[in-house]
Amino acid sequence: MEITLEKALKEIEGNKFFKVLKENDLVKVSYRFNAPQTFDTPLKRELRGITFSSKTGRVVSRPFHKFFNLGEHPETEKERLKGKLFILREKLDGTMLHPAVVEGRVRLFTQKDFANPQIEKGEELLRRNDKLLKATRRLLEKGLTPIFELISPEFQLVIPYETEELILTEVRDNRTGHYLLEEAENELIQMGFKLPRKRVGTVEEAERLIEEAENVEGFVAKNFDESEPFPLFVKIKSPWYHRAHYAFTYLHNIPDHKLFNLFLNNRADDIFATVTNPAVKEKKSRRLKILTDIYHSLLSSAEKLSQLYGKVKEETLKAEAQKELKKIEREFKEELKLFNFPVEHLTEAARLAKQKKKFDKFLGTKLYTALKHQTVKLKT
């Protein structure tokens, strides 16, 4: 499929699911949201970071078209794929980078950026490997886009890679969009490119291979029986990766009230044990410790105040409770952005503690609510 900048812009006119990014003479078109209606035409499936020259309107860098997980889309339903033979390439858990020659220099881009730390790392790896840099330039000068996956311990998502590398995952013709890696595999290896591991098999065989595997994302399955508008590509992910990626995404994005709720429901250990990314685990563990320390301080204050409950006037108890809250606020001043915990909750917890009732559960629920409504808020 031949694409020009004019055709791409016309395709997404007035469509909030897509955005246009510009840098000097470069124009990048990519989707904002991955929703079912986003990719309702073949042309829209090409708009995943495709990059054009604003001067000529021609494609200068063409990453993958949008393809789907097994069972995610009518074209990837298992019944439809049954018995088909696929080239199975190892699916890597990194960052896709695609290059272009800009003002005589080979530059890398991600799907939605012209510059970010992953791009800097990828360009550094290219500079350190002269053979790879020259091979990349040769393909670009032929009107082809080598598509790389950057793997690096520095940018770990789920799988803990020990080395940092640029792996060539495909090569596309900028004009036609044809995929060329499989037919040019031997030549590409001789040029100095490293390719993902490969085997041939059915979807059923691929699923069996990764059924019990750990630290494996899965396969990109490719079938070239049809080529227009695209060959059939399918993402097949391991059960382990689905679980680990869910846990990673959940923990990475979890707000403080839900993080604290994991603790209240004794689920924190299960989630943390599944996440393989040490940076995310450390950050969220540190945050959860602050939340639980605040909670334990509230419990201690309630127990202390319970000794006064029934012996002093309500106003006096409330004043003492206010002092306890101020003390907690001072104790955690480096961590707290806001601490408006209602004094009534603390006096009620003191009453429950005095009566040997579940004041701990009561305070946990109230702190969860305060975090949810952001009357108690940690610094970022």
From Swiss-Prot:
Keywords: Ligase. Its EC number is 6.5.1.-. It is an enzyme of class 6 (ligase). InterPro entries: T4-Rnl1-like_N. Signal peptide: none annotated. GO terms for molecular function: ligase activity. Putative RNA ligase. Is able to catalyze the adenylation reaction of ssDNA 3'-terminal phosphate (ssDNA 3'p) to 3'-adenylated DNA (ssDNA 3'pp5'A). This is Putative RNA ligase. It comes from Thermovibrio ammonificans (strain DSM 15698 / JCM 12110 / HB-1).
